[in-house]
Amino acid sequence: MPREKVRVLIVDDSASVRQILQTILNDDPDIEVMGTASDPFAAARRLQNEIPDVMILDIEMPRMDGMTFLRKIMAQRPIPVIICSSLTEEGSNVMFEAFEAGAVDIVPKPKIDTRQALLECSTRLREAVKSAARARVRPRAERRVVEKKLTADAIIPPPVQGKVRPTTERIVCIGASTGGTEALNDVLEMLPPHCPPLLIVQHMPAGFTAAFARRLDSVCQIRVKEAEDGEPVLPGSAYIAPGARHMLLQRIGLRYQIAIKDGPPVSRHRPSVDVLFRSAAQHAGANALGVIMTGMGDDGARGMLEMRKLGASTRAQDEDSCVVFGMPKEAIAHGGVEKVVPLHHIPREIMLWYQAGHVAVAG
């Protein structure tokens, strides 16, 4: 029996954008655009008759802006919503409001200036739609091109057993995707100032992560910033991988520092969780804790197994608290997960692991 297609409603005031999005999505045999709307009022009329699996929504529209419509939808009849908008530094705060209001993902409007740019945008959009269709949403208050899937070998060589130099410094590496922006907020705001350093890969487009880091920094006790190449890794700080670039952990003597590298997508993502986790296995070994959180796909599964093989502790977010139980599920299936915990237990797990290491060193 053929698999049912993901049915999508597109809401955007630009006729050309609606047409481009419709063409991109209908080219995928697993997706069907059930209709389009030029504004939220037209979309609301459409929703009275049929409910899509996923809605793609613009932010800036006449008569009613997308944010207001998103809040109404999530309060009255929640469905997975993807924000498709022009990403700018000035508009980043609006994007975070969208996540808080219940949007499951954000994608940039397709670029059609080059064939490669259009291909990358098309692939990202189709993957976002399929991921959103599997997302859990809760009520809130008011022909396909298959890319070669690269592994972390494209960026960093495999870790070698017995080659990790000793250090007493402990470090936490976290990977997340769909649903991760709010989940990371929940984790980081509960950590005390004396927590271990955290390196975080959250799948995000370029130009978005600096504002994300500033937003987290404003609500957390710890320092949160966008990671920079060559900067030292310090306790009480969290470092967010910049969008569209890989982040790696490195060692200078007994001290950790961050490396930011260009390169092809790994596990179809850049930044890639697999790349970060492999570098942690290579340079931190048993002094690392790997945490994999909500998200679609398998990025991080191989890297987490490499971490565990070299002595690291590992945790995965449980299915009930995930927006999409994809990345944790794959990491568990690969055998890389030591313990599965709900989202609200992750801060405690981090601190218990960190404090246990301090006791061991003191002893």
UniProtKB/Swiss-Prot annotation:
Modifications the protein undergoes after translation, according to the UniProt entry: Phosphorylated by CheA. Phosphorylation of the N-terminal regulatory domain activates the methylesterase activity.
Record localization: Cytoplasm
Recorded catalytic activity of this chain's protein: [protein]-L-glutamate 5-O-methyl ester + H2O = L-glutamyl-[protein] + methanol + H(+); L-glutaminyl-[protein] + H2O = L-glutamyl-[protein] + NH4(+)
CDD domains: CheB_Rec (cd16432), REC_CheB-like (cd17541)
One cellular component term from this protein's GO annotations in UniProt: cytoplasm
GO process annotations (BP): chemotaxis
Active site positions: 177, 203, 299
Residue numbers carrying 4-aspartylphosphate: 58
UniProt GO MF annotations: phosphorelay response regulator activity; protein-glutamate methylesterase activity; protein-glutamine glutaminase activity
Listed Pfam families: CheB_methylest, Response_reg
Residue ranges of every copy of the CheB-type methylesterase domain listed in the record: 166-357
Main location: cytoplasm
Misc note: B.japonicum does not have a chemotaxis group 1 operon.
Family to which this protein belongs: Belongs to the CheB family.
PANTHER family referenced in this protein's UniProt entry, alphabetically: PROTEIN-GLUTAMATE METHYLESTERASE/PROTEIN-GLUTAMINE GLUTAMINASE (PTHR42872), PROTEIN-GLUTAMATE METHYLESTERASE_PROTEIN-GLUTAMINE GLUTAMINASE (PTHR42872:SF6)
Function: Involved in chemotaxis. Part of a chemotaxis signal transduction system that modulates chemotaxis in response to various stimuli. Catalyzes the demethylation of specific methylglutamate residues introduced into the chemoreceptors (methyl-accepting chemotaxis proteins or MCP) by CheR. Also mediates the irreversible deamidation of specific glutamine residues to glutamic acid.
Protein name per the record: Protein-glutamate methylesterase/protein-glutamine glutaminase of group 3 operon
Upper taxonomic lineage: Bacteria, Pseudomonadati, Pseudomonadota, Alphaproteobacteria, Hyphomicrobiales
